[in-house]
């Protein structure tokens, strides 16, 4: 009986008029999906996270992205996210230019996680005691995504804040000086159609 009640709970609480209730609901659904994946990590429940990605309240959107980070971060669960990824990938990408900076930063972190998941060659592997970078193309994709977010957000005075927030989850990519130098030397910047702002080189450096 209790389990039956829990299964019906998200349908009500995800649409609650109070954003605090919606945020708590999404956070708990994410936990349930990780702990009881057989029962809750299904399209019937994933859709609630997908729908609330565009909730009008910042905290709800943040909880959604964090819940997804927990799911995509568990390789044992990612196979069940295939349909969700195909359905909501465009929306997840669009969140990197969210009007709320905290949401945008979490969205970038999520996409970095997904990038590493589907393009494992972008990770740094250690061979013979020396770090060797794999697939420059994957590194390039990461930087293009990050620079697109930085330019489109028009927050050029906050590059240091962005780097600080991404350092723990993408420190190895941010320290890819060779890749960064290659982007800086390009004549045709495919990631944007405007001159870099005053903080762009601080972001890259």
Curated annotation (Swiss-Prot):
Belongs to the SCC3 family. One of its GO terms (cellular component) is nucleus. It comes from the Eukaryota. This is Putative STAG3-like protein 1. PANTHER family: COHESIN SUBUNIT SA-3, STROMAL ANTIGEN. Its main location: nucleus. PROSITE patterns: SCD. It comes from Homo sapiens (Human). The keyword Magnesium does not apply. Keywords: Nucleus. It is found in: Nucleus. Residues 10-95 form the SCD domain.
């Amino acid at each position: 009986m209790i389990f039956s009640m829990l299964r019906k709970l998200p349908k009500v609480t995800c649409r609650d008029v109070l954003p605090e209730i919606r945020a708590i609901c999404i956070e708990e659904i994410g936990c349930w999906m990780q702990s009881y994946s057989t029962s809750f990590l299904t399209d019937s429940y994933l859709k609630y996270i997908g729908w609330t990605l565009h909730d009008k309240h910042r905290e709800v959107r943040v909880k959604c992205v964090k819940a997804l980070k927990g799911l995509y971060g568990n390789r044992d669960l990612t196979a069940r996210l295939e349909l969700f990824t195909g359905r909501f990938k465009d929306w997840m990408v669009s969140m990197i230019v969210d009007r709320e900076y905290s949401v945008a930063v979490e969205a970038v972190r999520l996409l970095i996680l997904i990038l590493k998941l589907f393009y494992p060659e972008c990770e740094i592997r250690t061979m013979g005691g020396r770090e060797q970078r794999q697939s420059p193309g994957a590194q390039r994709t990461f930087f293009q995504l990050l620079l697109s977010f930085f330019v489109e957000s028009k927050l050029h005075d906050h590059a240091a804040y962005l780097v600080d927030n991404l350092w723990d989850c993408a420190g190895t990519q941010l320290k890819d000086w060779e890749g960064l130098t290659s982007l800086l030397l390009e004549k045709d910047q495919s990631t944007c159609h405007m001159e870099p702002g005053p903080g762009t080189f601080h972001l890259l450096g």
